[in-house]
Amino acid sequence: WENGHWVEIPAMSIKREYNFDQVGDKDMYLLHHEEIESLAKNIPEAKRIRFFMTFGQSYLDHMRCLEDVGMLSTTPVNFNGQEIVPIQFLKALLPDPASLGPRTKGKTNIGCIFTGKKDGKDKTYYIYNVCDHQECYKEVGSQAISYTTGVPAMCGALMLLTGKWTTKGVHTVEEFDPDPYLDALDKYGLPRSESHNPALVDLSLIHI
């Protein structure tokens, strides 16, 4: 999202390396994610909203190989007299994600970097969480990807049940008071860290 409109680029075409606290240097890719849509709608004064996600080279190599041989296709094909969808067949062959918890190691780092003005002064702020896969498995029997999905949803439900958020209708999280929500995340396993001088992502090579 840039200057009031959507910008489309070829998939996985923009890569940047970033040093993540407790995780280290990782390649991350500019891509679409659904929260950009509600943020652009609810914060119209935002000039730019971007989302990056990290992928290892081995993962990307496997995905490209599967794509090249047609295993990521959603178009049905006939095999031995039966119609199958390649990607659905692939899913049946892959391990259940829930079974990966015991052997998943390392940490996740999920956060947001904001730049703008506050009280007339330029300000940069980085809020993030670091979550350990093995610690999550010890606590709830899942890895950190599931943990960092489930705990925020639980905290959102807690805000509704305790009356912290009372607006009627269908809303997204950025429309509510963030303070009690962030406090709940701190309490229930996703404590925040912050920096007022983070390294910014170099986007100077992107031409729109």
Language-model-derived ranges and their functions:
Residues 1-205:
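C-terminal catalytic/substrate-binding lobe primarily of soluble NAD(P)-dependent oxidoreductases
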